[in-house]
Regions:
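Residue-level detector of alpha-helix boundaries and kinks
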Residues: 7, 11, 31, 87, ...
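GST-like fold's C-terminal all-alpha helical module
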Residues: 48, 55-156
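Generic alpha-helical structural signal
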Residues: 20-23, 47, 103-107, 177, ...
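Short His-centered aromatic/hydrophobic patch
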Residues: 139-188
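GST-like domain detector, emphasizing the conserved glutathione-binding G-site
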Residues: 1-81
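C-terminal alpha-helix
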Residues: 25, 29, 112, 182-186
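Short acidic (Asp/Glu) and glycine-rich catalytic loops that position anionic groups and cofactors
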Residues: 2-5, 117, 160
């Protein structure tokens, strides 16, 4: 069975817990409001950037590894924590590369927004909001957690999310955070 989130169960279909499967379900359920552009080139960019944020070895994956590292390295690990770390593929090689990979992805995303801005556009791709904009708005909280009133997280878990290295903090281009805040204000 599926024991991770998010999970979407729809009709009699199997539960979905992969970002792209959930996205494709949303596309089928409401084809008039596409989150993936219909233009082929933009579609490829949308899926590629979405993977860079959500997918294996993407921003979320690498930030999670960085978040787990101090706990795994500690002698005072919560019960069952290593099972969760193992489930998510925690390994020393990927952990050592997590910051570097995160920085690269943040630079790609900032560059894309700057490119769009020079063309008078306010979204990652094209002239309208796409999955990339929503994914960035959500996953950006792994780099800079929004205040509790905007992003409720259990007070005992907030320190885990707020423990962000200076390397990552320094890569948070203002254009990324302004975009996150605008998307959150306008769409959430």
């Amino acid at each position: 069975g599926v024991n991770s989130g998010p999970v979407v169960a729809w009709d009699s279909g199997a539960p979905l817990n992969r970002w792209n499967d959930i996205l494709f379900l949303l596309e089928r359920l409401n084809p008039e409001r596409n989150l993936v552009p219909s233009d082929g080139s933009l579609r490829v960019q949308c899926m590629g950037l979405s993977h860079e944020i959500c997918g294996e070895l993407g921003l979320g994956w690498n930030r999670r590894l960085s978040m787990f590292r101090p706990i795994v390295d500690s002698s005072d690990r919560p019960g069952g924590f290593m099972n969760m770390a193992d489930k998510w593929g925690y390994n020393q090689t990927d952990v050592e590369m997590a910051e570097e990979r995160s920085v690269l992805i943040l630079r790609i995303l900032a560059g894309q927004l700057r490119f769009q801005k020079t063309h008078g556009r306010k979204f990652f791709l094209g002239d309208s909001v796409t999955a990339v904009d929503f994914y960035w708005a959500a996953f950006s909280n792994l780099c800079e957690l929004m205040p509790p009133e905007r992003c409720p997280v259990s007070p005992d878990r907030r320190p885990l999310f707020e423990n962000v290295s200076d390397v990552i903090k320094n890569e948070l281009d203002p254009i990324l955070m302004e975009h996150r805040d605008r998307v959150m204000d306008e769409y959430f």
